[in-house]
A protein has these predicted regions:
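Short alpha-helical transmembrane segments in multi-pass integral membrane proteins
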Residues: 1-23, 81-146, 179-182, 190-246, ...
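N-terminal transmembrane alpha-helices
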Residues: 10-47, 61-76, 80, 105-112, ...
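Transmembrane helical elements of multi-pass membrane transporters/channels
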Residues: 21-40, 142, 176, 205-209, ...
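Helix-terminus/linker motif at the lipid-water interface of multi-pass membrane proteins
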Residues: 31, 35-54, 123-130, 186-193, ...
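Alpha-helical transmembrane segments of multipass membrane proteins
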Residues: 38-42, 113, 121, 155-159, ...
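Small-residue-rich hydrophobic transmembrane alpha-helices
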Residues: 53-113, 150-169, 263, 276-340, ...
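Short runs within selected transmembrane alpha-helices of multi-pass transporters and secretion channels
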Residues: 74, 142-161, 169-177, 198-213, ...
């Protein structure tokens, strides 16, 4: 059934309640996406061995590095569509929809080509261990074949989020997630396909979710309707998406680049530490996505209220999203750290792998609330229309700082503990600078409103 896109008003009513109702399905959707990866890792670790587990895990940072630039563009689509929706600009929403879906497909095919043909070279540049690089390359090539569908899902779901719809994408992912788990078991256990099987299961399930979400846009009767016969770029919409999305994508890429450097450092400790790091980071991802739902809520709510000129709501959006994200990080991060050992045993029965994973979780999970707060502050800046500023802050505060840390402190104290400490140090410094920038932007906006009111 087609949905009336005029029902997603995020500018009035009890703001905290709306943020929570918006974020819960979003968090559940993100967790389901992580379950795709978790199913891969658990099935491989249990039924294909620690070498195959390391092969799948060693790809995570590299995949994020290549994908995040274009995922940032989908955030640009979300901001532009939300602002047009808040301003009741139906033509702007329509142009954004057609442009966004086209951009998603084009970027997906580009990533598929680059990822497939450059897989081995990129893994070698990351110092991927020799005993896993063959399997890692195979997994990466198959994974990137499905990239057009992954990008199509990201852009289509971003458009639905812009009008407050986070429930229907959740249903689509639930269906795809069930398919992914079943196919993992069939391909790995029944057909003994190892990493090739889990990669194939992932791209099949992502294709299902992409087709379902895109079908929702096609069935829309309001301005969010997608006309597949008129796909193409609208210059005005494309320019706005790129203005917001490119800096956001570059910021995500900056984080991923520093993670690639850290992954290379992890690789220097051998396949056991790589496997433990892979399992731990997969578990941490559940904490992060729960927090990040409130960062995504912050950018959508801020964008709609900017479009509707409800500037009085902006501070409430920031405070509520910040509170929810920090509390979520504190509760889930602390819980994951306390239950780290039994949770890691889901991924591997090898005690040395579990011990290596715990070394990471005790540092990252207990400080993850800093990352959540940092993301919310950056999202509030983006929603207000400042896209370059949070990118520059992240470039210096995260990428540069982590690179310096790896080149100096980690070289002096060559331990995994000192390596993992680079995360919380960069989070807190970057968050403080984001907060300072947001306060300056807020003051400037208030002064401009006072001047406009006096005219």
């Amino acid at each position: 059934m087609a949905q009336n896109t005029r029902t997603g008003d995020l500018t009035s009513g009890p703001m905290l309640q709306k943020i929570i109702l918006f974020s819960l399905p979003l968090a559940a959707s993100s967790i389901l996406q992580l379950l795709f990866n978790a199913a891969d890792v658990v099935v491989v670790g249990r039924f294909a061995g620690s070498t195959a587990l390391a092969a799948v895990g060693s790809n995570g940072a590299l995949i994020n590095l290549l994908v995040n630039l274009f995922v940032g563009l989908s955030l640009g689509a979300n901001v532009v569509a939300a602002r047009c929706f808040g301003a009741k600009d139906d033509e702007g929403v329509r142009n954004t929809v057609q442009t966004s879906v086209t951009l998603g497909l084009v970027s997906g095919f580009f990533l598929a080509v680059v990822g497939f043909f450059a897989a081995r070279v990129l893994l070698e540049l990351m110092s991927c261990p020799e005993d896993v690089i063959g399997l890692s390359t195979l997994y990466l090539k198959i994974y990137f074949i499905g990239m057009p569908m992954t990008m199509l899902y990201n852009f289509s779901s971003a458009l639905l989020r812009a009008v407050g719809d986070t429930r229907r994408p959740l249903f689509c992912l639930a269906v795809a997630g069930a398919i992914n788990v079943v196919l993992n078991l069939v391909f790995v256990i029944l057909f003994s396909m190892s990493v090739a099987g889990v990669a194939l299961a992932t791209i099949i399930s992502q294709t299902v979710s992409a087709c379902m979400v895109t079908a929702l846009l096609v069935k829309e009767k309001g301005p969010l309707h997608l006309d597949l016969g008129h796909l193409g770029f609208h210059a005005g919409a494309l320019g706005q998406i790129l203005r917001i999305g490119l800096p956001a994508g570059l910021q995500s890429t900056v984080f991923s680049l520093s993670n690639v450097v850290i992954q290379s450092a992890v690789n220097s400790f051998g396949s056991i530490v790589v496997a433990g790091n892979s399992a731990a980071s997969n578990l941490e991802g559940f904490v992060y996505t729960a927090m990040n739902a409130f960062a995504q809520a912050a950018v959508t709510f801020t964008s709609q209220n900017m479009g509707a000129r409800r500037y009085d709501n902006l501070d409430r959006v920031m405070r509520n999203c910040l509170l929810c994200s920090i509390v979520t990080g504190l509760v889930l991060g602390g819980g994951a750290s306390l239950l780290g050992e039994p949770l890691l045993h889901f991924y591997s029965s090898d005690e040395v792998v579990v011990t290596a994973g715990l070394a990471r979780m005790h540092i990252i999970c207990t400080t993850y609330l800093l990352c959540g707060g940092m993301d919310v502050l950056a999202s509030c800046l983006r929603g207000r229309g400042y896209s370059v500023l949070p990118m520059v802050v992240s470039l210096v505060g995260s990428c540069l700082l982590r690179l310096v840390w790896i080149a100096t402190i980690f070289q002096l104290f060559h331990t995994t503990t000192m390596l993992y400490l680079s995360y919380p140090v960069s989070w807190i410094l970057t968050a403080l600078v984001h907060l300072a920038c947001l306060l300056v932007v807020r003051h400037k906006m208030n002064e401009n409103l006072k001047v406009a009111a006096q005219r």
